[in-house]
Design a protein with these regions (language model features):
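Short internal beta-strands
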Residues: 321, 345-354
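Cofactor-cradling patches in redox/metallo enzymes
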Residues: 311, 320-330
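Alpha-helical structural signal in soluble globular domains
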Residues: 334-342, 359, 363-367
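ATP-dependent carboxylate/acyl-activation modules
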Residues: 1-201, 205-319, 353-354, 358-365, ...
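Short Gly/Thr/Asp-enriched flexible loops that form oxyanion-binding sites at enzyme active sites
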Residues: 113, 327-338
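Hydrophobic alpha-helical segments
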Residues: 311, 342-345
């Protein structure tokens, strides 16, 4: 579960990490009072549109403003709008709040500081770079030598040697070691106690006073651990999530909306990826990733079809099922039920393979529905594209 910047920094500040003075507003009527508390007469304040996406600055969603009338115009423009960045897609994301931050610039240095769960090593990895304030992907591509990662065994936790290694990479003055060490330990505590899946502070700034400050923060919480944190569950902002993805999560379906026009329903994440790949291989684009899982039932298949056809971009549907534990004849009956129930008129091609595949294909052929059953994934992809065109 992703958090807004102001929510992330509130959690970090609660763990003792240094964050700027800031207040989030949801209505323009709140602006004048908040401006009095946050803005500096000479430097104004930083106003940031709150969305779950990067690239806000380049999209016009972050401004340093010195006068209240300028801030009022910005808030009026942003609140209730759709902010489009390189990470949001063409539809953008809804702006329901604006964060007013004290202007802490100029600063001595901007750093990158991140933490992520490394599933391969089953450890938490710190990622640091002296090049902060820019997209870390750009740094990784252009100057990878400026990024360093330090893997931490969860059984031992952060040790002084780990902190010294990061400190050396950041090329900081010796007198800053105690403050940096304190920051690392606070971040480790927050990451573990609050079950973060990702923490990104970009930039972590070093002020002229020698003080570290989290100028921006991104936090993703581990969905599987949310049951331990009811106080964090209320931080979810469903306006930032695709409605179909939210509905799929409630139904325990793995769904990701994409930009194409061929809806996909598959059992198994790997098979779903292969299905999308072959659609792209033959020149079309998938409209979604949808894994109904190994425990597919008639109800889950029906819900999956409803999700797919709720997307107006979908012009055809490809179903790819490999029957193992799940029998293909059961899936075929579920497909027939779903197509009848939802009155789906779009072209549908079904590839069944494995357990009771022949029986499943017979049921589809005798259903009287305009659904085509094929044996191979290659044939399925070619046929659905032919029907689409």
């Amino acid at each position: 579960m992703n958090l807004h910047e102001y929510q992330a920094k509130s959690l970090l500040a609660g763990m003792g990490m240094p964050c700027p003075k800031e207040i989030a507003i949801q209505q323009i009527s709140q602006l004048a009072d908040v401006w009095q508390h946050i803005a500096c007469p000479s430097k104004g304040a930083v106003l940031k549109a709150q969305v779950h996406a990067g690239g806000r600055g380049k999209a016009g969603g972050v401004k340093v403003l010195k006068q209240l009338p300028e801030a009022q115009a910005f808030v009026q423009q942003m609140l209730g709008s759709q902010l489009v960045t390189y990470q949001t897609g063409s539809e953008g994301q809804y702006v329901s709040s604006i964060l007013l931050c004290e202007n802490i610039y100029p600063v001595r240095q901007e750093l990158y500081f991140g933490m992520v769960v490394d599933r391969e090593s089953q450890r938490v990895t710190f990622i640091v770079s002296p090049e902060g304030g820019v997209e870390i992907e750009k740094v990784a591509h252009e100057t990878p030598e400026k990024i360093s990662s330090v893997s931490i065994d969860p059984l031992t936790g952060v040790q002084p040697c780990h902190i010294r290694e990061m400190f050396a990479v950041l090329q900081l003055e010796h007198g800053l070691f105690a403050a940096f060490s304190r920051l690392v330990n606070q971040a480790w505590k927050a990451f573990n106690e609050l079950d973060f899946a990702l923490l990104e502070i970009n930039p972590l700034v070093l002020r002229e006073t020698g003080e570290f400050m989290c100028a921006d923060a991104k936090v993703s919480l581990d969905d599987n651990a949310l049951y331990r944190h009811p106080e964090l569950q209320v931080l979810r902002d469903e306006t930032q999530e695709d409605p179909r993805e939210s509905q799929a999560a409630k139904l325990d379906l793995n769904y990701v909306s994409l930009d194409g026009n061929i809806g996909c329903m598959v059992n198994g994440a790997g098979l779903a990826m292969a299905t999308m790949d072959i659609i792209k291989l033959y020149g079309e684009q998938p409209a979604n990733f949808l894994d109904v899982g190994g425990g597919a039932t008639q109800e889950r298949v029906s819900e999956a079809f409803r999700l797919i056809v709720s997307d107006s971009k979908v012009k055809a549907i490809l179903v790819n099922i490999f029957g193992g534990i799940v029998r293909c004849d059961m899936i075929a009956r579920a497909i027939i039920h779903a197509l009848n129930e939802a009155r789906i008129t779009l072209p549908v091609v079904v590839r069944l393979s494995g357990n009771n595949a022949a029986e499943g294909q017979r049921l589809l052929a005798e259903s009287g529905l305009t659904v085509e059953a094929v044996d191979s994934l290659d044939d399925a992809a070619k046929r659905i594209i032919a029907l689409l065109n």
